[in-house]
Amino acid sequence: MEVNGVSQSEAAPYVTKSSVKFRDNFWGSEDAGMDALMSRTKSSLSVLESIDEFYAKRASIEREYASKLQELAASSADIPEVGSTLNNILSMRTETGSMAKAHEEVSQQINTELRNKIREYIDQTEQQKVVAANAIEELYQKKTALEIDLSEKKDAYEYSCNKLNSYMRQTKKMTGRELDKYNLKIRQAALAVKKMDAEYRETNELLLTVTREWIDRWTEVCDAFQHIEEYRLEFLKTNMWAYANIISTACVKDDESCEKIRLTLENTNIDEDITQMIQNEGTGTTIPPLPEFNDYFKENGLNYDIDQLISKAPSYPYSSSRPSASASLASSPTRSAFRPKTSETVSSEVVSSPPTSPLHSPVKPVSNEQVEQVTEVELSIPVPSIQEAESQKPVLTGSSMRRPSVTSPTFEVAARPLTSMDVRSSHNAETEVQAIPAATDISPEVKEGKNSENAITKDNDDIILSSQLQPTATGSRSSRLSFSRHGHGSQTSLGSIKRKSIMERMGRPTSPFMGSSFSNMGSRSTSPTKEGFASNQHATGASVQSDELEDIDPRANVVLNVGPNMLSVGEAPVESTSKEEDKDVPDPIANAMAELSSSMRRRQSTSVDDEAPVSLSKTSSSTRLNGLGYHSRNTSIASDIDGVPKKSTLGAPPAAHTSAQMQRMSNSFASQTKQVFGEQRTENSARESLRHSRSNMSRSPSPMLSRRSSTLRPSFERSASSLSVRQSDVVSPAPSTRARGQSVSGQQRPSSSMSLYGEYNKSQPQLSMQRSVSPNPLGPNRRSSSVLQSQKSTSSNTSNRNNGGYSGSRPSSEMGHRYGSMSGRSMRQVSQRSTSRARSPEPTNRNSVQSKNVDPRATFTAEGEPILGYVIALYDYQAQIPEEISFQKGDTLMVLRTQEDGWWDGEIINVPNSKRGLFPSNFVQTV
């Protein structure tokens, strides 16, 4: 019998060995046994695959282990041993190499003997499974089809029978023609029942035959699957046995290698190894002699009693501890190095000490008891030895710091009253222990004072010579600690200088409000009362500067580099520096107190139109702040609107552009366009819209004009009210105005406001500006430089002479507002005062003045494009791209279009072959 071309004997040539048979246990309804055996065959194959993967990983481990053992055995480190110990170490290395080879063989055997056999068995089992499944698959499908057909025919047969039965029941109630009709239906139903009965019987017989064949074939398939399962289990047993043998072989080889190592170790001879090591490394048997004490005096025949010499030496009191801050100040090299100070010197220093504030009080006289106490304290300072004096002579003579005489009280630190700057300097000196390196240049004052210094130091020769046998360890230590604080220590102290910023090294505050340049930092004085102190400080300024290159403070004003354009932001124009503020560091707490007091003063004020009270309040407040040692620039913090103080960040940089400002700027540009094409546009409206767009722009972070605007603020605030009141008046400038200012202030007031508002003065020369009392008048040298710079600024702005009084004051205010140093609150105060004056009973005069000073420039270009306004260049600018234009300082440009990013579109006027292009708005000033 053949099924699918495979004979029954070939399909099931299996003989089972187990007493339990699959044929007796895999039956059931709907052939459930067949599904169980098929799933078992699949799972058995997956087990074989997992074992093959296990062998692969073990072979990889053995191969890696063998490789590492081989590297360990092949290490070529030198062995400083001899004899049997060397043989033992070499044997261990050799046997380790043998173990590596054994494990390499284990890896190869696992791959060849175990894994290959598993792959072969998997292939063979799959073939047997396919043969057994094919032998029963067709019969299984035929049996399933007959079962379905038999079920359908059975249903049809039962339906026909039920129909015939219903007809027969209905005929009992019918007669006549209706009975004849039902008899016809009964006949047809009987024929259908007969037909369905024949088909049902035939299908049943066929299914019976197929089922019997299926039983026989399934029995054979069960035997085949049982044979496959028995063989698989036997194969796994054999394969894993071989695995154990292979691993055991490797272990045996490892044990053999270990046994060889043990045999080598048994041959170790320690005596021979020691003997051979001595022969190779021995250095001799002679013991070196013991050290002996050699008495210098006995060897040279000298008979000195050291104890007696020590008792004869004079002893001076000296301190072995670290000198305090006062002792360090007293022993500063700015005093005489080796002489005690007399009472006359101390008294002269105390009496001639300069005041530390502009509003100083007279110095109280010092009594003789206080002078004696100071002299006693200074005489208790330890006197350095002659060796120290000799070692410190080059330092003192090479330094540019001169020794102050009796007539120079500004350098006497001990007698001068301490200020806040002194306290901070002393605190920094004690905490950081900084050393100031000596400068290379020597001032003329030092050269002139050499002879006097030599004469003064001769008084101390006896004391110095008498102390030459005194131990100098403690004295040199205290002297080092004293001099290291002032920059006159040894080379090692100079190497430990802490790096400081430029502003700190120059002794200047690093606040962004102090925008002075480096060139004028040491030469400018605060007031005429402090000019002597400033000149002396400038003489010693070079000595406190370090020769080494140090990092530039990020807040220092040095140079603004825009492409090839180098702008000296540290050197502000001279006209804005005629009013120099105090050089003390602005205290944040003082700024906050000034802001609070100013805001309370604003709330108490009843009207902004009262000119005299406002001017007097500002003058008195600035006077009080200057009296307390604060800067006049701090008054910008107290500037507010309608009594509401503006939030201050106390020295923080200005904020960047905000989206609201950009939106307002865009709206202003749109309204300008509508005004140009929707209604008649005048020159004044174009200029006002341009100024409005400039005022809405955020302040530039450039610190160029920080000091100029801060110095301008006090004079601007004092003259703002009088300026707004007298705009409509036409008065010729009389000398009496200047005489009044001189009689009140004592000397002519600097013309910083006049130089910055040159356009206003040029357009209306008849306008008089009433000056208030200056709290800190400047010296003649400062005033002359301001006048010269005012003339220079006036000549550079000749194109602005016809702008009117009110517009003439706008450029400088906008310039200060744009560069961020001059507070916007001060400008809003001026605008409020100007607005209040505009509502005064004299509007006709002001309008008449402005109408007379209308700029004759065109408001439209030749192509009909509207001109937004005119600007004047503050700096030189070199174009970086073809779309930009270059200009020089003083050039006048027309503005045709503005952008939110600060770049404006325009053209230089009164220049042949000029082209249109972009230029930066922070390089120009609105005319």
UniProtKB/Swiss-Prot annotation:
Disulfide-bonded cysteines = none
Give the residue ranges for region: Disordered: 321-370, 390-409, 423-495, 509-550, 597-857
Main localization (coarse) = cytoplasm
Q: Which residues carry this modification: Phosphothreonine?
A: 529
Which superkingdom?
A: Eukaryota
> Residues bearing Phosphoserine?
331-332, 636, 639, 700, 774
Q: Which Pfam families match?
A: FCH, SH3_1
GO CC field = actin cortical patch; cell division site; cell tip; cytoplasm; cytoplasmic side of plasma membrane; mating projection tip; medial cortical node; medial membrane band
Q: Where is the composition biased (Basic and acidic residues)?
A: 444-461, 680-691
Which SMART domains did the record assign?
Answer: FCH, SH3
Q: Name one GO biological process term.
A: establishment of bipolar cell polarity
Coiled-coil ranges (or none) = 108-207
Single annotated GO MF: phospholipid binding
Key words of the record: Cell cycle, Cell division, Coiled coil, Cytoplasm, Cytoskeleton, Mitosis, Phosphoprotein, SH3 domain
Q: Where are the transmembrane segments?
A: none
| Biased composition range(s): Polar residues | 397-409, 465-482, 513-546, 616-625, 658-675, 718-730, 739-775, 823-853
CDD domains, per database record: F-BAR_PombeCdc15_like, SH3
Key word Transmembrane helix present: no
Q: What does this protein do?
A: After the onset of mitosis, forms a ring-like structure which colocalizes with the medial actin ring. Appears to mediate cytoskeletal rearrangements required for cytokinesis. Essential for viability.
Q: What is known of its domains?
A: The N-terminal region is in a coiled coil structure.
Indicate what this protein is called per its UniProt record. Answer: Cell division control protein 15
Q: Which gene encodes it?
A: cdc15
